[in-house]
């Protein structure tokens, strides 16, 4: 079976997407299938993709996670990995996500702006783009000068920016994979960056972050995480895999965002969580391919 891997695109996460695609390509080949790389920006992409009935989506950021690529594939009648357009839209737009869930799960207080406003929170606080990933454009703001500089910088690049309460605690990531129509919670990862926070450089530079599996998390924390996971899965329709980024403080779990097309690089969170559960990268990819086979058979 030929399996096209859709990668690249024009987003600011293009390079991460290409790295994910390389890893998935090698794994699909190891599993005995025939992988094909298709770059979303190729002129003949639409003609090429119509030769297949299934596609592996590793386009991070714009197009891949904002619902546009899944919408195109559905129009073409092509099954694909990861979540449907509606779920992608509701999670990639961080303010829509906040608005949907702020009354049901713990989240940092957040406001949206498209201009320079008075700081709504005491320093430090966070600013981040309304729509972006891999911590692009995310800054911890400590004073007025930083606020003006980084807010103006983000507004020029992203048009709309979230100003968010800073919750100082332990950064964790919560990964789920789908197997036999059921989502499995993988071991929680504690993220320990050597920088002030888990920014783009810390995520994708070897040695700048320790990803520490929490194999014996307190039952109280696991229960809260399961409640969060169950609530978002009852509200939105996920497929194959997804990841929740959160802050753990005083036994409370504060949800930051959800990633519907998790990174699959050697340094990415979800494969690290899977490995801590005894699931190799090849096994992870095979589970996802088997999900497709089950969907088609069903």
UniProtKB/Swiss-Prot annotation:
Task: Share an example GO biological-process annotation for this protein.
Answer: regulation of cell shape
Which key words tag this protein in UniProt? ATP-binding, Cell shape, Cell wall biogenesis/degradation, Cytoplasm, Ligase, Magnesium, Manganese, Metal-binding, Nucleotide-binding, Peptidoglycan synthesis
Q: In which pathway does it act?
A: Cell wall biogenesis; peptidoglycan biosynthesis
What are the EC numbers?
A: 6.3.2.4
Which Pfam families is this protein grouped with? Dala_Dala_lig_C
From the Swiss-Prot or TrEMBL record, what is one GO molecular function term? Answer: metal ion binding
Protein residues bound to ATP: 124-173
UniProt domain ATP-grasp: residue ranges: 97-290
Cofactor needs: Mg(2+); Mn(2+)
Q: Does the keyword Ligase apply?
A: yes
Note how many cofactor molecules are bound and how: Binds 2 magnesium or manganese ions per subunit.
Q: Give the main EC class.
A: ligase
What is its biological role?
Cell wall formation.
What does the similarity note say?
A: Belongs to the D-alanine--D-alanine ligase family.
Q: What is this protein called?
A: D-alanine--D-alanine ligase
- Which organism was this protein described from? Petrotoga mobilis (strain DSM 10674 / SJ95)
């Amino acid at each position: 079976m030929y399996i096209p891997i859709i990668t690249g695109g024009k987003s600011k996460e293009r390079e991460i997407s290409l790295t994910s695609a390389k890893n998935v390509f090698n794994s699909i080949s190891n599993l005995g299938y025939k992988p094909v790389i298709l770059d979303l920006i190729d002129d003949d992409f639409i003609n090429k993709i119509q030769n297949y009935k299934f596609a592996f989506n590793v386009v991070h950021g714009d197009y891949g996670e904002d619902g546009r690529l899944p919408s195109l594939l559905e129009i073409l009648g092509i099954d694909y990995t990861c979540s449907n357009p509606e779920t992608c839209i509701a999670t990639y737009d961080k303010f829509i996500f906040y608005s949907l869930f702020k009354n049901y799960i713990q989240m940092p207080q957040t406001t949206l702006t498209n201009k320079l406003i008075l700081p709504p929170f005491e320093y430090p606080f966070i600013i981040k783009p309304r729509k972006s990933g891999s911590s692009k454009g995310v800054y911890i703001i400590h004073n007025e000068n930083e606020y003006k500089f980084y807010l103006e910088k983000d507004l020029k690049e992203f048009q709309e920016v979230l100003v968010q309460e800073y919750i100082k605690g332990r950064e964790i990531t919560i990964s789920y994979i789908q197997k036999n129509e059921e989502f499995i919670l993988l071991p929680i990862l504690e993220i320990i960056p050597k920088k002030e926070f888990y920014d783009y450089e810390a995520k994708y530079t070897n040695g700048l972050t320790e990803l520490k599996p929490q194999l014996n998390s307190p039952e109280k924390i696991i229960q809260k995480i399961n409640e969060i996971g169950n609530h978002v899965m009852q509200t939105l329709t996920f497929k194959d895999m997804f990841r929740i980024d959160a802050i753990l403080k005083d036994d409370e779990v504060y949800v930051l965002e959800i990633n519907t097309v998790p990174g699959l690089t050697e340094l990415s969170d979800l494969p690290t969580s899977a490995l801590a559960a005894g699931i190799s990268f090849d096994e992870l990819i095979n589970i996802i391919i088997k999900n497709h086979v089950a969907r088609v058979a069903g």
